[in-house]
């Protein structure tokens, strides 16, 4: 069948393909016609960047479909990785490399399996699926490599009565695991335990190594008295959820309860009270949230952000987007909200008309940026 590939210069290339062709094959055909190396090609269809190993039929690309070709400038760069022994490793990477890719490169150089590597930049532990550009890691940035050692150690837990409990743990144990070990020894249910280290309340899903808890560290155990209260959580759709909580509950705990009720992952939740966004490690009592208080829940799309779109009538529309969304995606979201077909929309930012195949990040459109929407009258340009 025939498909079309449109470049940013406006040129359209026609390719003969089969639905079983992979995206790699298509990139090779483009190289044959245009001389552009596959590793500099990004192909976009229906607002999605296409992955090399997938086939055209995987993406439901049919005859006479149009793909958009965006060039990936050779964006090789060097970064440094510093180990705890003080050794510095130099890596050749691209901003689009994922943290997994970087760990594989470290394995190639140093022989350390990726699952024993933790990479830190600007004080943050880097997540495998994210890219270097997601973390704004630029050329000659230095990452820190911490090894996740296999193997156990002892830690101490001190109660308010002054009693000290000794536990056998591993750095990869989660706080939940530690609470279960305390329950085994002392019979205290995990939901009545609050663990404190270095002045911080420890969150259940995190590991000991996340908090830099090492052998012979001492944690403090505070009991959470039963004696709950009800609070309300109001969503943007106007729905109100009732939760049973305690003043000593952390914001993380509250988000977990919302997940149990509504199925919304905590990392997509933003909670607002008295105009303030609530921070995960803090407790309800830190914010003076009392019984029958109402919190507001705003959804955070993955890696998402809000942008505004202003129409000529002066109306402003708020959209939840991601930097990797293409202009097509944004037009579809506007259609969902306002009913305006994408082909009648022209979007302007910083005086430039935005092109469909490009992404928000291509135009450096960041959270709370304002785009302008101009309607394209039928029959005109």
From Swiss-Prot:
Gene3D superfamilies: Phosphatidylinositol 3-kinase Catalytic Subunit, Chain A, domain 1 (3.10.20.90)
Consequence of substituting residue 48 to R: Deficiency in ubiquitin-protein conjugate formation
Function: Ubiquitin exists either covalently attached to another protein, or free (unanchored). When covalently bound, it is conjugated to target proteins via an isopeptide bond either as a monomer (monoubiquitin), a polymer linked via different Lys residues of the ubiquitin (polyubiquitin chains) or a linear polymer linked via the initiator Met of the ubiquitin (linear polyubiquitin chains).
Name of the protein in question: Polyubiquitin
GO MF term set: protein tag activity; ubiquitin protein ligase binding
One Gene Ontology CC term in the entry: nucleus
Location(s) in or outside the cell: Cytoplasm; Nucleus
Domain Ubiquitin-like: 1-76, 77-152, 153-228, 229-304, 305-380
GO biological process, one term: modification-dependent protein catabolic process
Family in the record: Belongs to the ubiquitin family.
Glycyl lysine isopeptide (Gly-Lys) (interchain with K-? in acceptor proteins) crosslink site(s): 76
Record keywords: Cytoplasm, Isopeptide bond, Nucleus, Repeat, Ubl conjugation
Cross-link Glycyl lysine isopeptide (Lys-Gly) (interchain with G-Cter in ubiquitin): where in chain: 6, 11, 27, 29, 33, 48, 63
Documented effect of changing residue 63 to R: Deficiency in ubiquitin-protein conjugate formation. Loss of DNA repair function
InterPro entries reported in the protein's UniProt record: Ubiquitin-like_dom (IPR000626), Ubiquitin-like_domsf (IPR029071), Ubiquitin_CS (IPR019954), Ubiquitin_dom (IPR019956), Ubiquitin_ubiquitin-like (IPR050158)
Cleaved propeptide residues: 381
Miscellaneous information on this protein: Ubiquitin is encoded by several different genes. UBI1 and UBI2 genes code for a single copy of ubiquitin fused to the ribosomal proteins eL40A and eL40B, respectively. UBI3 is a polyprotein with one copy of ubiquitin fused to ribosomal protein eS31. UBI4 is a polyprotein containing 5 exact head to tail repeats of ubiquitin.
């Amino acid at each position: 069948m025939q498909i079309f590939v449109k470049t940013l210069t406006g040129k359209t290339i026609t390719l003969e393909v089969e639905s079983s062709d992979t995206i790699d094959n298509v990139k090779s055909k483009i190289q044959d016609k245009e001389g552009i190396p596959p590793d500099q090609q990004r192909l976009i269809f229906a607002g999605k960047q296409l992955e090399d190993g997938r086939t055209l039929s995987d993406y439901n690309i049919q005859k006479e479909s149009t793909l958009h070709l965006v060039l990936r400038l050779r964006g090789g760069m060097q970064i440094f990785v510093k180990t705890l022994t003080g050794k510095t490793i130099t890596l050749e990477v691209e901003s689009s490399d994922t943290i997994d890719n970087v760990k594989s490169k470290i394995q190639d150089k140093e022989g350390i399996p990726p699952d024993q590597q933790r990479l830190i930049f600007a004080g943050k532990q880097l997540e495998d699926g994210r890219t270097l550009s997601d973390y704004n890691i630029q050329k000659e940035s230095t990452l820190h490599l911490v090894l996740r050692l296999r193997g156990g150690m002892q830690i101490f837990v001190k109660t308010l009565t002054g009693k000290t409990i000794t536990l056998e743990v591993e750095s990869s144990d989660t706080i939940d695991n530690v609470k279960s070990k305390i329950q085994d020894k002392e019979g205290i249910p995990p939901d009545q335990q609050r663990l404190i280290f270095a002045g911080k309340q420890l969150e259940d899903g995190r590991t000991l190594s996340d908090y830099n808890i090492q052998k012979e560290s001492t944690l403090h155990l505070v009991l959470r008295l039963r004696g709950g209260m009800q609070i309300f959580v109001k969503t943007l759709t106007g729905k109100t959820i009732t939760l049973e909580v305690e003043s000593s509950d952390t914001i993380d705990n509250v988000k977990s309860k919302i997940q149990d009720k509504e199925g919304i992952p905590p990392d997509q939740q933003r909670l607002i009270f008295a105009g303030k966004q609530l921070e995960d490690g803090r407790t309800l009592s830190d914010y003076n949230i009392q019984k029958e208080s109402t919190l507001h829940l705003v959804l955070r799309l993955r890696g998402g952000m809000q942008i505004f779109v202003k129409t000529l009538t002066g109306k402003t529309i708020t959209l939840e987007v991601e930097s990797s969304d293409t202009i097509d995606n944004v037009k579809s979201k506007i259609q969902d909200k306002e009913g305006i077909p994408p082909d009648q929309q022209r979007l302007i930012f910083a005086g430039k008309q935005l092109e469909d195949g490009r992404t928000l990040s291509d135009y450096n459109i960041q959270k709370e940026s304002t785009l302008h929407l101009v309607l394209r009258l039928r029959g005109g340009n």
